[in-house]
């Protein structure tokens, strides 16, 4: 039987949920404007900050990130179905479709955001250690330079360097598409950097598949997410190169 039906269903769910851009109805409801027509014209959390302020921007960022977590939870639910069609449902692969949906949403004529918040959600699902590192690096550079695009690019580059080390997953060796044997050793020692992957242990108890997403799957998913971020930040990269990128908040002038 085809054991990957769960991946297909969860990926479709992820794309459709990813296509929900919370910044659009929120800016319309709070200020009565279209986010596509004000600020940077981008329907993301950063532009929401410019239009509505930090609190609403944070709310949009959290809602966008939760789209990935909800999709992962949906995939977990499918993997618990005691049927071979769902026995090898990946929790990682469907999450990348949330980023695709966010950037090219079917509900908004394929005009989406830049998926930084969704990428953070992806890191939480694949390896929350990467999320913490990205988050720290992002805030350091955001505080110093006040440029979201620069902070996102540097944070992404940092994860790109670290993610090739098996120890960052809590395992001693590299695993390919099925990482169950590698991760079960780490889980038994209570080393769980890939927390969502742990739910494969419970699904295995239901149908005995002994399947878990491997490091390679996680790395491929993160790499695809990085490519999406670079593509969506192409104009920002040009502005950074030309030193014309505007800070999200200008530095306050010191009183003399």
From Swiss-Prot:
Major localization listed first in the record, in broad terms: membrane
GO cellular component terms listed in the entry, alphabetical order: plasma membrane
Record protein name field: Glycerol-3-phosphate acyltransferase
Family listed: Belongs to the PlsY family.
Any GO MF annotation of the entry: acyl-phosphate glycerol-3-phosphate acyltransferase activity
Catalytic activity, as annotated: an acyl phosphate + sn-glycerol 3-phosphate = a 1-acyl-sn-glycero-3-phosphate + phosphate
Assembly description: Probably interacts with PlsX.
């Amino acid at each position: 039987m085809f054991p990957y039906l769960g991946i297909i269903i969860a990926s479709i769910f992820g794309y459709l949920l990813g296509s929900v851009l919370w910044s659009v109805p929120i800016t319309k409801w709070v200020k009565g404007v279209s986010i596509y027509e004000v600020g940077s014209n981008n329907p993301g959390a950063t532009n929401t900050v410019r239009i509505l302020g930090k609190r609403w921007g944070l709310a949009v960022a959290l809602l966008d990130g939760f789209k990935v977590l909800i999709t992962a939870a949906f995939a977990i639910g499918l993997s618990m179905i005691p049927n071979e069609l769902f026995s090898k449902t990946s929790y990682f692969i469907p999450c990348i479709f949330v980023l695709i949906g966010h950037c090219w949403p079917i509900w908004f004529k394929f005009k989406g955001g830049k998926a930084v918040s969704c990428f953070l959600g992806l890191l939480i699902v694949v390896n929350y250690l990467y999320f913490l590192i990205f988050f720290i690096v992002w805030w350091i550079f955001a505080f110093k330079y006040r440029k979201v695009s620069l902070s996102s690019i540097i944070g992404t580059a940092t994860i790109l360097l670290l993610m090739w080390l098996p120890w960052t997953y809590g395992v001693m060796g590299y695993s390919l598409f099925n990482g169950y044997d590698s991760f079960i050793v780490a889980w038994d020692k209570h080393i769980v950097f890939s927390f969502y992957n742990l739910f494969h242990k419970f699904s295995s108890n239901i149908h005995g598949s002994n399947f878990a997403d491997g490091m390679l799957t996680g790395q491929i998913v993160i790499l695809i997410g990085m490519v999406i971020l670079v593509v969506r930040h192409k104009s920002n990269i040009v502005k950074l190169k030309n030193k014309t990128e505007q800070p999200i908040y200008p530095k306050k002038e010191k009183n003399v």
